[in-house]
């Protein structure tokens, strides 16, 4: 999922938010997920079958709206000889704008940033967006390690998918009943073998997780007994991986069952991670504002200038940012001017500063999308900040929804 851009994730989140707010009067909003290997002709046939079955809907208005939505889907399918590389997602339905009779047909058709896994046709009073949510979750990678003295399993968690990377066994001997010097000598052998096993686990953890360190959101460690604590407290893993440990869990099992147990026991921690990640970046930004380093910037103009210079390490965008970039072009002399307007503000009329001709709007783009594109061009990390935290609200209200953490001080 590392090839999925910040812009794509931002657009999916934005679309998700829009779709979740849509509600039909009855079970008349249609959602279709088409995997890339699915034949368009097969989908079109099923849509025609659904169109026929919809004649049995008792409510005249619901029947009419469902049939209209399916007909729109059938027409849109004709534009695709085959599904795009990652499949196709379609949301179609009549959305009420007020009282009865105010319904308007709304259509969303797009290729998701990650391949559609399962063909789905869904008709309800709300759009079926759960698979889209999983696409966003899939970008978030967690490392999971479960261990005791006898074995260890290393895995990754992406969304709801668990991938087992490595299973190791130790060969560490069990308890020995001999007494005296033999016992002490044997205990030393056991401790040395256990130490070597932890070193071996550490090497495999580094091999598995270091290539993912930029996208790795956290590491979960679990297992029965104290071995997991010895592993965490010792210098067995690379510091960049160690710094990402977010939870240590007592489990009853190792192996695959232990991995699932660690994940289940870490549910609350995982839920908190997005918020903690946002808080971390916002605190770094706020610290930069008041420190002598001066490694913080905010405001649309300043952040854009720093992005164009390649000086921004992390771009912070509020999910509540509601503005657009309007590009004006003079039809007489081709002079170009770009301004920012509020989301629902009527764009003003502009005259060319050179020839006084009325300029035409030739491009409209959300400010967030434009800044994210700039960020990707210069390899700047992007964090879309929610307004669910005090820091997120502060970014939105006090800093205009746009801020940056700089790579170096700009004079």
Curated annotation (Swiss-Prot):
Instruction: Indicate the principal place this protein occupies in or around the cell.
Output: cytoplasm
What are the protein's GO molecular function terms?
translation release factor activity, codon specific
Task: Give the UniProt subcellular location, in the record's own words.
Answer: Cytoplasm
For this protein, the record's SMART domains field holds: eRF1_1 (SM01194)
This protein's source sits in the domain of life called Archaea
Q: How does it assemble?
A: Heterodimer of two subunits, one of which binds GTP.
Task performed by this protein: Directs the termination of nascent peptide synthesis (translation) in response to the termination codons UAA, UAG and UGA.
Q: What is this protein called?
A: Peptide chain release factor subunit 1
